[in-house]
Structure formats: C-alpha cells, structure tokens
Design a protein with these regions (language model features):
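Hydrophobic helical membrane-anchoring modules
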Residues: 78, 91, 96-121
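Conserved core of the sugar-phosphate nucleotidyltransferase
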Residues: 3-93
Length: 121
C-alpha cells in the first residue's frame, strides 16, 4: 500500500465498516472517486454520451480500486479475486487516496504530508 496520507482513523473506520457489512457483501474496497469525462484507449466514451455531453458535475463518479481491500475469509480461500463478487465501496478523500507511482506523485505526497504534519491542512 502506497498511500502515505492514509491515517489510522480512516483505517479503523474501514475495518468497522467491513465488520458491519450485510451478509450479501463479500468485500469492502477503499476507492478513490473521480468525476470527469472518461474515455478508453480507443477514444470511446466510458461514462457519457458523446452526442450529448453534460457538464462533469452531472456525471456519476468512477472509482479507482486497489487502495485497501478486506475480504471475507471464505471468499479469500475460494477465489484469487481481490475485489470480491459483491463488494461494497468505501470512498476515500482525495488526499488519503493519493497513491505513489511516479516521482511527481512522491513529491506531491511529500508536500501534503509536510503540510498536514505542520497543521496547515
């Protein structure tokens, strides 16, 4: 996990939310919601109608998974699927969802980490 701004309170709330899941949910995924006009690698719209483009504030969010995952034990033993078959979503705020994949990501995370620990955010 490379989310350096994820705090222990959020992790505790995540575990509590998992423990409170209804029986029909087999996983809890911490996700990063993103709203915008998304296209696939061919340029095909994913979440909007290209003939009638709405403002992004009218679009449903899409979610990036892989931030944190908890699975029911029986599911984890039976499958190698880290998303579950009927997951519930646990949205993270933008700072806590920040992932480090590049040098720029690292520098941005370092900037916000320092600001948070200085009490500025």
């Amino acid at each position: 996990m490379t989310q350096p701004l994820l705090n222990r309170t959020t992790i505790a709330r995540f575990v509590d939310a998992f423990c409170a899941l209804p029986a029909e949910r087999d996983a809890l995924l911490a996700v990063a919601p993103h709203v915008g006009h998304f296209i696939d690698k061919r340029g095909t719209p994913v979440n909007f109608d290209a003939e009638r483009i709405l403002g992004s504030q009218h679009l449903d969010a899409l979610y990036v998974a892989g931030k944190m995952t908890l699975l029911r034990v029986d599911h984890a033993r039976e499958r190698a699927n880290l998303l579950g078959t009927s997951p519930a979503l646990f949205p993270l705020d933008e700072l806590e969802a920040m992932d480090i994949d590049t040098q720029v990501d690292f520098e941005m995370a370092q900037y916000f980490y320092n600001r948070r620990h200085a009490g500025l955010i």
